[in-house]
Amino acid sequence: MTWCNDRSDVQTVERIIPSPGAAESPVASLPVSCHKTCPSCGHNFKFHEQAGIHDLPGLPAGVKFDPTDQEVLEHLEGKVRDDAKKLHPLIDEFIRTIDGENGICYTHPEKLPGVNKDGTVRHFFHRPSKAYTTGTRKRRKVHTDSDVGGETRWHKTGKTRPVLAGGRVRGYKKILVLYTNYGKQKKPEKTNWVMHQYHLGTSEEEKEGELVVSKVFYQTQPRQCGGSVAAAATAKDRPYLHGLGGGGGRHLHYHLHHNNGNGKSNGSGGTAGAGEYYHNIPAIISFNQTGIQNHLVHDSQPFIP
């Protein structure tokens, strides 16, 4: 589903009428505003061509930027291909671009714009760089003010998974976890910082200099295994457990989409939750989970990362 941005939208054109007696000169009629339709809900609203996010009336409390894996790749595709119909006019307000050859992996996540330890997700466009001038190994060492406690670096965990859309591979997703004390006598220490990195194409590895998109967050809730998921749920806020078949195994998703009182989930269209739980995962799956809490926008203010 893409953003409606074609020229067939109904437009309101302002016409300048000259004063009596003045010579009428040709004046280009410029579109002042037009009506656009949201591709998700079908709502029509008045849109000003020259307006920005600060001109919007504000977003209702509870609105969040929580794209699925497929939607993340859709935003990335619109960014790299400069497709006006795929690139949302406000996407740069929600997915910032980190310039520079070192990308995200050079900077500690705490120093990235808008990132903190409350579980909120932040998305970034960036370009991974190589660790060495030769070879294909990516740079994942994080620059810190002091390396007394050992190196800090991102470590890839699990397999690189394909993201499917329409029955075909649109790109790949890899999950990285931040570790400290690399290179010391003791075992490296795992932190709660997590990064999901996405790239387009049919190759498991991104190309050198290729634009990718990553979401970075601090995991605030511990992961649990299999049967302990249901036991951890309280009677008041019991998560929904969905069993998805895949080969001979079972894939469980733990969603924090609590009941809102009328029997419906208060979540949005994407399936987002506070954790992911796997048991005998099939070889190829399509990810839809963020793994943490979602963005929240309060006080009816526009969300600006």
Curated annotation (Swiss-Prot):
Domain NAC: start-end pairs: 59-219
BP term (GO), one: regulation of secondary cell wall biogenesis
Tissues expressing this chain: Expressed in protoxylem and elongating interfascicular fiber cells of elongating internodes, developing metaxylem cells and interfascicular fibers of non-elongating internodes and developing secondary xylem of roots.
Pfam families named among the record's database cross-references: NAM
Alphabetical list of InterPro entries matching this protein: NAC-dom, NAC_dom_sf, SOG1-like
GO molecular function: DNA-binding transcription factor activity; transcription cis-regulatory region binding
Gene3D superfamilies xref list: NAC domain
A single Gene Ontology CC term: nucleus
DNA bind region: 170-225
SUPFAM superfamilies: NAC domain (SSF101941)
Annotated keywords: Activator, DNA-binding, Nucleus, Transcription, Transcription regulation
UniProt remark on domains: The NAC domain includes a DNA binding domain and a dimerization domain.
Protein name, as recorded: NAC domain-containing protein 73
Top-level taxonomy: Eukaryota, Viridiplantae, Streptophyta, Embryophyta, Tracheophyta
Gene behind this protein: NAC073
